[in-house]
Amino acid sequence: VSYLDTLADAVPPQVEVVYGVGGGLVSDVAKYLGWKKNIPVVVIPTVLSQDGFFTALVAARQGGTTHYVETGPVSKLIVNWDVIRTAPPNVRGAGIIELLTIVTGLLDWRYAAEHNKTTVDTRFQPWAAGIMAGLAQQAFKIASGVGKGNIESLRNLLDLMCLEVQLTNQLGHNRPQEGSEQLFAYAYEQKFPRSRPLPYADRVGPGLLIAASLHGQDVGPIRETLA
């Protein structure tokens, strides 16, 4: 957070808009700067690597942990499919992980409800679980096309991520979308620090397989989709 504040302090007063061109990290930095300077933010993603392009939050690291800062959403998002389509295959559609984590998110959410570990605000809601499960099912269906850079599949991915973000915003929490796979991702990051952090999907993917296995799920379809 302190580094982001330093960047914000260095923004000249005559700047009227912040443009972010790149992946999820670039988007987060742009949103944070726009929020601190109270100016519009325009993001042009070069990959569909995560759902952060569409959220009102920024994931900022401080003291070895990740904190979420509510900055508000971007003012405008410009998607050029020719740019997305030609991105490196390993990150081009990596945002599909945001839909696959629904699998463990829902399993953890139901488990917590069965053991009276939810709050009034995060109580299990079958209607929401049903909708989110449908989004995850669609992710498995489009995965092959996303991996091949098929524009229609990438459009589907973008729409599904938007719906996922919209529903979690409506619920006011991420229980149906994120699960215990996140614990693995953050633990790995702490145990094996790197000068350049691993992409989000690369950290969460193994955790997703572990969490699903702990719930007794067949991880074959998930492994194939991640591949």
Predicted segment positions?
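Short, well-ordered alpha-helices that flank and scaffold nucleotide-derived cofactor binding pockets
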Residues: 9, 32-35, 186, 190
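ATP/NTP phosphate-donor binding region
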Residues: 1-17
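A short, small-residue-rich loop immediately preceding and capping a beta-strand
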Residues: 13-33, 37-46
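Active-site segments that bind and position negatively charged phosphate/pyrophosphate groups
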Residues: 124-226
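Short, intrinsically disordered, charge-balanced linker/junction segments flanking boundaries
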Residues: 1-4, 223-227
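Generic hydrophobic alpha-helical membrane-span motif
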Residues: 30, 51, 86, 187-188
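A glycine/threonine-rich phosphate-anchoring loop and its flanking beta-alpha core
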Residues: 35-135
